[in-house]
Every structure is written in C-alpha cells, then in structure tokens.
Amino acid sequence: MVRFKDKNLDMLRVALRQRESEMLSPIATLSTEGVRRVHDLSSEKGFRQIFSVDADRILHSRAYTRYIDKTQVFYLIHNDHITHRVLHVQLVSKIARTIGRYMGLNEDLIEAISLGHDIGHTPFGHDGERFLSELCRSNGIGYFQHNVQSVHFLDKVECKGKGWNLCLQTLDGILCHDGEIHNRTLEPIRNKTFERLEKEMLAKKNNLEIKLIPMTLEGCVVRMADTVSYIGRDIEDAIRLKMIKRSDLPRESVAILGDTNGTIVYNLVTDIIKNSFQNSYVAFSPEVSDALKRLKDFNLERIYMNPEIKKHTGLIKKLFAMLFEKYLDDIETENRTSVIFTGFLEDMSEDYIKSHCKEEIVRDFIAGMTDHYFLRQCPENMRPKMQFK
C-alpha cells in the first residue's frame, strides 16, 4: 500500500485549493473561507477540503443513521417504495450539487448542508414536529423547529454533547434551509458570525414567523433544492398510495412543469440554472415560480392535509405528551432504569447535562428518535397499527 508523506499531502491540499480558486465562481464560497467555532488542527491535515470534512462528519454521525426510519410525509405505512427522510436528503444533495456545478459553486459545502439539513426532524414528520413544539412551548423552552434542532444536534448533542465542530457556513445553511417557504429569488446575507447564528436560532425559537436567509449562495441553492426534491416525489408517493390521481394535478402547473417527478425536477432545475447563472442570487422565472406555488398549494390540500394520513394524529399527539411527561418525571425522580438514562444520558458528557434543563434534555431525546423507536417506548395497547399498502 502506498503511504503518502505529510509533505505530499500538503502539496495535494495546496493544489486542490489552487484548482478550486481557478474553477469556482468569484461569488462561490472557497474552502479557505470555512470557519469553525473551535480551531481544529485535525481537519486541516490530509487532503480533504474543510467542507468535505463537514460532510463526512455528518454522514458518519449517529443522527444521520437514524434518518433511515424517519417519516418524510407518510407514516405507519408498510411500503418499500415510499420515501423516507434518508432518501430525501440524498435527493436534495444530488439536485443541489447539480445546480451548484453549473453555477460554479462549492459542491462540498452544498453536500454538507444537504446531508445535515433534516438531522433535527422528529419522528412522524411535520406532525411530530408540531406536537413536540406545543410541548416545548408549554414547558417554557420556546417553539420546536427542526432546522434549529438540526444545528443544535450537530453542534451540542452529537459526540456525547461535544458536537462535531462544523463550519459556520454549514450550520448557517442548515438553519436557513426552510423549504416550506416559497421564494422566487434568494440572495445571501453574507459576513455572518457564530454570534449571529446563535441570535437567529434564539429568535426562531421565540417567533415562528422569523424568516432567515442563508449567508452563502450554496445555502440558497440547498433551500431551493429542498423544494425541488420533495414536490414531485410526494406526488408520486401519493399516487402509489392511491390518494390522488395524476389527472388531479393542476393543469396550469402541468403545462409548465410536467406531471411526473422526473419532468418536474428537470424543468425546475433547468429554470433555476437559466435564471441564476453568473448572478449573485438563486431564482426561478416568474412563470415557473407561479406554477410551483400552485403545485405546492395542491400538495398541501390534497396530500399533506389528506384525512387518510391524518387519522392517527390524535393518538400520536397523546403519545408525544405521555412520553414527554414520563421522561420529565424520570429525570426528576432519578429513575436510572428509564430509557432516557440508559439510552441517552448515560452516554452524554457532564457539560451537556449541566448546560441543559430537564425539558431540553427530554426534547433532544424525543426529537432524535426514529418512528419505530418512539412506538416501542409506548404502551403496546396504545400503539397505532401499521398499514400494508
């Protein structure tokens, strides 16, 4: 096996940086601009660029592993072809890197943001997020937002509470990724700091209406790609589950975007590239933006609010409240046989335990659960039944 000497790795790293500076757009984020909260000598050695290290750290995190059993839209359904969150983040990464390549942006940073953007999502998707947010709010720790939790998890919970020491640009892109908000144009707000990151996280916890803008073009691309990745995929899943028919799609949107996931993704990506190339912003054309907005409205009414996927929400909400109260009580009474100790706190550092109140600890534990792990913690006679479709 050939072993590289440190000198060879140094030369390789210099060559990669030189190539990056020559090939990327003047408004791309160079790897040399990456800023960590704590100086990290280990990430500066070897041949990997700084944002590539971030992507690797996220990919090898325990939280990333749990994507495999977290709901995207449809839960309590046995169907091997329905999208789960692990596939969603891969689709976001692929679509965003494709756009970024044609815009001359940093694909390593795009990949890191994409892979980490949903780390903080609860079990049972946005319904679970809403239930946990109500519990957090009533227990005095602010609203729960999965984008805020994603940053918190990667920065303060992973690695026994030490976090992964990711770059500011990566964490900012994750925080500002909100794909549910419709934007025709996104232009980055540059020159942010870790102090501003903390302020934006706090503001978002206290006010759901706060709108955040990424600090990099790469972050803006991921935010647009988030929507591109799910809009057609959710339609295909809903058709597969016989909740809608392809002929139900709004004609105005179909005329511009097509009626299959493949054509929708292709047309949206092409439009973004055409309208963003060599610009300081990322944008859709007005026509495509309007068609996408109509399609999002259709998905909301016919898929996300469909009674067929909402029939267990009352029970799941009750189970969230039951577990939240149980774990609070277990911490207060120091019930060390409880899973919140054996499955979580026993693996966390003293710094994490001392710097988080019991309500925040319970929030972090529940938010990190997969769908099946959550259900296994509930009384067997209260667990909703899985459907085979």
Question: How does the language model describe each region?
Answer:
Residues 110-115, 223:
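Short alpha-helical catalytic segment bearing the HExxH-like zincin motif
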Residues 125-138:
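A glycine- and small-aliphatic-rich helix-loop capping segment at beta-alpha/alpha-beta transitions
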